[in-house]
Amino acid sequence: FRNKKGRKETFQADYRIKRRTRKTAYSSISLPDMINQDCYPFTFVHRSRNCGQGILYVDIYRFKSTKSNLTYLVRVERYEHNMYAVKFYQKNHRLSPKKYQILSHTYEARRIIYTCMNVMFSVYKENPRASFGFIGANCEGENEADTKRYRVYRKIVATQISEEQFIHTRNKEKSASTISNLL
C-alpha cells in the first residue's frame, strides 16, 4: 500500500515501527527490573468494586497473543494493606470454574508471564507501596503442592524482581508466593 506521502510500505514494516515505539515508551518508566522485551501490549478494560471476600476492587486488563491469536485477561485483585493478587486466563475460558488450570498449548508461557509482570509493574507505578501475590494453579491430575506453574512463576519472579526492594516469601505446600514491598 502507499502512505500519505505516496511512498510504498508494507504492513510488516509498519508493524515494526509501532513495536519499536512501544518498547521505547516502556523503557522510559523507571521501575525495578522493568521487563520491556518479549511481551505483548496490554490495555486496561474496567474496574469492579464491592467484590466481597476482602477484595477492595478488581482491575481487568486485556492483551492479545500475536502468535496464537488468543486473547488473555489479567485480573488484578486489590486487598487491604496494598496487597494485589495477579491472575490470568484465556478470555474464551472466562466462564469456566477451572479457567486458571486450563493449559493453552501455545508454547508461549514466558511471553505471557512477562506481559502479566508488565501489568504488575504498571500497578506498582500507580501505587509504589504495592505488594503482590500469586498462586501457581495445578493442572488436571497434579497435586496442589509445588506445581509446575508455581516453579515457573517463582523462577521468573526471582530473576526479574530485585530482593533489595521486595521480600520474596514462598509456600511450596500451597504453591503460593508473595513479593512484599519494603516501603
Where are these regions (language model features)?
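Non-catalytic substrate-recognition and accessory regions of acyl/acetyltransferase enzymes
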Residues: 1-183
